[in-house]
Structures are given as C-alpha cells and as structure tokens.
Amino acid sequence: MIKQRTLKTPVKATGVGLHSGVKVEMTLRPAAPDSGIVFRRVDLEPPAELKADPYLVTDTRLCSMLESGAAKVSTVEHLMSALAGLGIDNLLVDLTGPEIPIMDGSSAPFVFLLQSAGIVEQNAAKRYVRITRPIEVRDGDKWARFVPHHGFKIEFTIDFKHPVFDKSGKTVTIDFADTAYTKEVARARTFGFMHEVEYLRNQGLALGGSLDNAIVMDEYRVLNQDGLRYDDEFVKHKVLDAIGDLYLLGHPIIGAFEAYKSGHALNNALLRELLQHREAWEFVSFEHDEDVPSAFLRLHPLAA
C-alpha cells in the first residue's frame, strides 16, 4: 500500500519571522501515523498545540496564520508547501515564537532540512482527498477552483501592473506528473514592493523582511543583485503558496487547482467551501503503486 510518511530524526533551524521580525528556533520532529501536521508553541506555558486545519486559519493578510485560543502561528505556508512537495503526512513542529522562520523566502531551505533528516514510511495507508465535482469561490474578479483530475495539477494567473511583471510569466501550468516540485517550484521566493514596506511596517507586518528573504521591487525593477531564480518566479511563488495553503486540509489532493489572482484568503475559502460539499470529494487510499496517479509517485520519491 501507499504509506504515510514522517521524518527519520528530528532537525532544527533558527531564523527570523518575516512579519514579526522575531528570532525563532524551530524543531521538526517525527510524529505518529494519522497525527497530521501539528505546530507546538513551546515558549508558552503550558505549551499550545495547533493542528494544520483550514478552520484554524484566521488572519490571511500576506500569510496564513493559525490561531487557537491565545496561541498563534503565522506564515505556515512555505513549510506546509515543502511538506506537501515531499509527501510528509505526520510531523511535530516545535516553535519558540509566533511565526515560522522565513529562511530565504522560498521553501527550498525546508526541503533541504527535511531531506537531511531523512523521510521514512509508516505502517498506515496514506489518505488522499479526491475531487469528484468542481468547486469554485470568487471575490470580485478573483477566483479559485478545484476540478476533478487524475493527478495533481495547478494553473495560476497573476496580474500586477508593474514593468517587471510584463517581462515575467503571468500564467503558469504545472502538472506534477512531469514536473518535480523540488526543482521547479521550491526555490521561488516571496516578493514585495518598496512602496508597500513603510505601510506594512506601520501595520506590524514585514518587520523581518529584507533582500535576503524576498524579491523586492521599486517602481521599475528588481532590486536584488542576483535577479530572479526562475523567469516566472513571481507566479511560481504563488503556486508554492497555494500548495502550502491547500495542504492545510491535512491530505494530498487528487485534482486540479485553477486560480486567477488568488491569495491566502481565497485559497482558504476554497478549502472551506470544499468541506461544506461532502458530495464533491472522497477519501481514497491505494493498495498498489500502479494505481496511484503518476503525479504523486513523481512528487514523492523516498529519500535514500
């Protein structure tokens, strides 16, 4: 059968929160089958646990924040994206602060950390959510939807009025049956504009942001000395975010995700809409490799 996965050994990283600017130590630990992804605020007394769950997402200004009682964990989407990309089902994430460290603004450092710790299979069947009917949410001209598809595919379009975006791709279609997440998506960094920085900081956001962990643009160009990592890095980062936001469902999705100008709020609204329509999805597990959509066999090679 296709089995659930966790880490072989614990692994640690330290960094600053993109929005809080606070230094945080994060420890990723193996977890039991069927426990899902659980964040633990070990700096609180008593320590607070927050499970990856679409209904715990409260603040979606520029990131996805989980909140339960007095405990919050923000900017979970890049780590969640790496976990989805590597097919990790169960994990404990111990944090000494309110935010996942931003690292370099992409999910590549998390992919490296997870692969360094080693990934192991567990004696329990992996449960997928298979989309059986289209589900869509809209907000003005923005929209996001799931449609049935035997695999995992994302089509995303962004629309920013800025000279840099005219040169970069605005639409990307990624079918994971023939594309590796770690190679084509994981290195895409978060991005922002100089003119927004002052406003964001007054709102208590982006306090840890810098050219080391984001693509920053003025009115005309990218300010980072090394330029872009992919020609279409902006829209690929939106794909990276979406993969992380959607993995808050707690299961890999068999289906296609299509979006126009979607962000954390709409991604979360789509998950909640899906859960409201029990007839639009089903749980599936696979006894044999040959029954699994090739997107998932390719997405999740087991580390040696």
Curated annotation (Swiss-Prot):
E.C. no: 3.5.1.108
GO biological process: one example: lipid A biosynthetic process
A cellular component term, taken from the record's GO annotations: membrane
Phylogenetic lineage: Bacteria, Pseudomonadati, Pseudomonadota, Betaproteobacteria, Nitrosomonadales
InterPro entries the UniProt entry points to: Ribosomal_Su5_D2-typ_SF, UDP-acyl_GlcNac_deAcase, UDP-acyl_GlcNac_deAcase_C, UDP-acyl_N-AcGlcN_deAcase_N
The keyword Metal-binding appears for this protein: yes
Chain's role: Catalyzes the hydrolysis of UDP-3-O-myristoyl-N-acetylglucosamine to form UDP-3-O-myristoylglucosamine and acetate, the committed step in lipid A biosynthesis.
Keywords on record: Hydrolase, Lipid A biosynthesis, Lipid biosynthesis, Lipid metabolism, Metal-binding, Zinc
Pathway note: Glycolipid biosynthesis; lipid IV(A) biosynthesis; lipid IV(A) from (3R)-3-hydroxytetradecanoyl-[acyl-carrier-protein] and UDP-N-acetyl-alpha-D-glucosamine: step 2/6
Top EC class of this enzyme: hydrolase
Family: Belongs to the LpxC family.
Reactions performed catalytically: a UDP-3-O-[(3R)-3-hydroxyacyl]-N-acetyl-alpha-D-glucosamine + H2O = a UDP-3-O-[(3R)-3-hydroxyacyl]-alpha-D-glucosamine + acetate
Active site: H264
GO MF, one example: UDP-3-O-acyl-N-acetylglucosamine deacetylase activity
Cofactor(s) in the UniProt record: Zn(2+)
Chain residues that bind Zn(2+): H78, H237, D241
TM regions (residue ranges): none
Species: Thiobacillus denitrificans (strain ATCC 25259 / T1)
This protein's record includes keyword Hydrolase: yes
Protein name as annotated: UDP-3-O-acyl-N-acetylglucosamine deacetylase
